A protein has these predicted regions:
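A short helix-to-beta-strand connector/capping loop
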Residues: 81-84, 139, 164
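Active-site core of PLP-dependent enzymes with the aminotransferase class I/II
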Residues: 92-99, 115-139
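Hydrophobic beta-strand scaffold residues
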Residues: 107, 136, 143-144
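Buried hydrophobic positions in well-ordered alpha/beta secondary-structure cores of metabolic enzymes
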Residues: 1, 24, 37, 85, ...
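Conserved PLP phosphate-binding loop immediately N-terminal to the Schiff-base lysine helix
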Residues: 113-126, 140-163
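Active-site PLP attachment segment
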Residues: 163-171
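General beta-strand structural signal in soluble alpha/beta enzymes
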Residues: 10-14, 39, 112, 143-146, ...
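PLP-dependent aspartate aminotransferase-fold enzymes
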Residues: 2-106
C-alpha cells in the first residue's frame, strides 16, 4: 500500500471506513491542536458524530448556497457537534475558499471524498482539489482524502488520478 498510494508512509488498519475517518480526524486534531473540521456538503465519511453533518441536505433548510449551514444527518448528535464543522459547497472553488479563509485559524482538517459516493460518484474538479491542497498547505491544516469508495478510481486512488497528495487518507 505504501508503494501504491502517494500519501501513505504508514498504515493503520481499522474495521470500517467510519473508524478510519474518525482516526484521521483525531490525528489531525492532535497534530494541529485545533478542533474544527471542514467537509463538503453531501460528503459521507461514516456514522460518527464529527462527520454526520450535512450528508443529505434539504435546500429549504440548509442555508444559503454560499454559506451552507451545518445540518445534523441524524438525531442524537452530541451537543456542540454542529459548531465544530464548517460546511463548504462541493466543486464551488471560490465560495469554498472564502468559507475556509473565514475559519482557517480554527481548522484542524479538511476532509473530502475526491469522488462523492453518496450522490452517485460525482468527481471533484481538479481546480477544486488543487485549491484545497494549496489552501491547507499554506495554513497548517491537514488535508484528508476519504477514499473508502473512490480508491477504486485507479491503482493509486483518486490522489494518483488527480496528482494531488493529501496529508492523510482513509480507505
Amino acid at each position: 500500500l505504501c508503494e501504491r498510494i502517494p500519501s501513505f508512509d504508514l498504515v493503520r488498519f481499522t474495521n470500517s471506513g467510519t473508524e478510519a475517518t474518525l482516526n484521521t480526524i483525531r490525528a489531525a486534531r492532535a497534530v494541529t491542536g485545533k478542533s474544527k473540521i471542514a467537509k463538503v456538503e453531501g460528503g459521507y465519511h461514516g456514522s460518527h458524530d464529527q462527520v454526520s453533518v450535512s450528508v443529505r441536505t434539504n435546500p429549504a433548510k440548509s442555508g444559503e448556497r454560499t454559506r451552507p449551514d451545518a445540518m445534523p444527518a441524524t438525531e442524537g448528535l452530541g451537543e456542540g457537534t454542529l459548531d465544530q464543522v464548517v460546511v463548504i459547497p462541493f466543486n464551488e472553488t471560490t465560495i469554498a475558499k472564502r468559507r475556509l479563509e473565514e475559519n482557517k485559524d480554527d481548522l484542524a482538517a479538511v476532509i473530502i471524498e475526491p469522488m462523492l459516493g453518496s450522490v452517485g460518484m460525482l468527481p471533484a474538479t481538479s481546480e477544486f482539489l488543487s485549491m484545497l491542497r494549496e489552501f491547507t498547505a499554506d495554513n497548517g491544516i491537514i488535508l484528508i482524502f476519504d477514499e473508502v469508495i473512490s480508491y477504486r478510481a485507479s491503482s493509486g486512488g483518486c490522489q494518483e488520478y488527480y496528482g494531488i497528495t493529501p496529508d492523510m487518507s482513509s480507505l
